[in-house]
Amino acid sequence: MKLIVKVFPEITIKSPPVRKKFIRQLGKNIRTVLRELDADIVVGGVWDNLEVETRLTDPKVLQGIRERLSCMPGIANFLQVAEYPLGDLDDVVAKCELHYADLLPGKMFSVRCKRAGRHDFSSMDVEKYVGSKLRMQCGAAGIELKKPDLVVRMEIRDQRLFVVHDQHQGMGGYPLGALEQTLVLMSGGFDSTVAAYQIMRRGLMAHFCFFNLGGRAHELGVMEVAHFIWKKYGSSQRVLFVSVPFEEVLGEILQKVDNSHMGVVLKRMMLRAASAVADRLEIDVLVTGEAISQVASQTLPNLSLIDAATDKLVLRPLVATHKQDIVDLATEIGTADFARHMPEYCGVISVNPKTNAKRNRVEYEEKQFDMAILEQALERAKLVSIDRVIDDLSRNVDIEEVSQALAGQVILDIRHPDAQEDQPLQVPGVEIQTLPFYALNSRFKALDDTRQYLLYCDKGVMSRLHAHHLLSEGHANVRVYRPS
């Protein structure tokens, strides 16, 4: 399979050195991400396009390549093509006929040709000649330039002809690694996950910073969604997941700060802590998922007060986005199900919160706060490479594993729904239920507690983690299923 990758249009208007830098970085990213699927993948480049070629023919691998390219920042779109040496125009007709003859009968169609190099014909000459011949030879209903049923696409570059099979949409944006790094404050809800995606889509590397207010289950949930976002949209770069224990900070706020100012003070403490983490990582930009007036702490006066707690630039990609649009985008990018089952703690600590907090009052409230507690939280912060975050969580987790399921037991397939659909689990004589890992903790208590459940995932890592959590919650009817 051969693909022609079209770069983000804004890259093409950069100066030659910058343009080369960005395209070189994009090629590097493509090799990094696709090497998992094909160790011999070939990626070559020209001035405004990259060519990707694999000799593998496994449909699942080829689909995986297309899916990964469609989720890679820096790509406007990519074409699946068949390449031939350029002959005369009759030869071009013959090559197009090979690919479109079965599709054209009864269709209104057009021909589109893009050309680069020196030739004795123009792109329009090709379109007219090929269109006329295909109409006569393939039983097409006619030619329609404005709203055709089918478009015959090709590209000619010097002495190479590319007949286009299909076109796939990319994310746009700049290649990750070509621009600056950011630190995204992650709660795991709709807003923070979509904000992280928007930043990555534009081409900024996103490290993840989580303030743990809710214990192990919340931390696990945020790690899972952060890993999902990175794996799907940013795995060309290695980034960090930072977890800061904030329970004691929250406790100090609850004890010392006036109830109506708790939300603003908590956000200011988070920005202070995030700034310290960013300094450690040499990052100048923080990212949050706040939108104007979505909650009391996000009014313009309060956002201004919150920003005053740091000298870092604070980006808010969703600042003017409606909530339903955020939810819709979360559904589109795959984080909505994670968010629906994620506990949200920041919004429940204030009663009658101030929507127009005053600086002098906020500073007075913060004087009651023991800043040593914030320093201690930062000292206990954990930094883990995002690609190892789930493995590190499962380390030293001792859970009973079984290689065979018995009659009466239930296997819970906790894989992502995509994996469940692509490779359904089948164990003769044993009941299998599907319950994605991100919904397991919230829905397990509704299951029949008289039955024994065996958690299953591909590598056993997620199943061990969730089994450990369920056991710690008092559910003794949980094991891990690891077929031999």
From Swiss-Prot:
Domain Rhodanese: 405-483
Subcellular location(s) of the protein: Cytoplasm
Domain THUMP: 63-167
Catalytic center residues: 457
Broad class of the protein's primary localization: cytoplasm
Superkingdom classification of source: Bacteria
Pathway assigned to this chain's UniProt record: Cofactor biosynthesis; thiamine diphosphate biosynthesis
Catalytic activity: [ThiI sulfur-carrier protein]-S-sulfanyl-L-cysteine + a uridine in tRNA + 2 reduced [2Fe-2S]-[ferredoxin] + ATP + H(+) = [ThiI sulfur-carrier protein]-L-cysteine + a 4-thiouridine in tRNA + 2 oxidized [2Fe-2S]-[ferredoxin] + AMP + diphosphate; [ThiS sulfur-carrier protein]-C-terminal Gly-Gly-AMP + S-sulfanyl-L-cysteinyl-[cysteine desulfurase] + AH2 = [ThiS sulfur-carrier protein]-C-terminal-Gly-aminoethanethioate + L-cysteinyl-[cysteine desulfurase] + A + AMP + 2 H(+)
Residues given in the record as ATP binding sites: 185-186, 267, 289, 298
A GO molecular-function descriptor: CCA tRNA nucleotidyltransferase activity
PANTHER family noted in UniProt: TRNA SULFURTRANSFERASE
Protein name: tRNA sulfurtransferase
Native organism: Pseudomonas syringae pv. syringae (strain B728a)
Gene name of the encoded protein: thiI
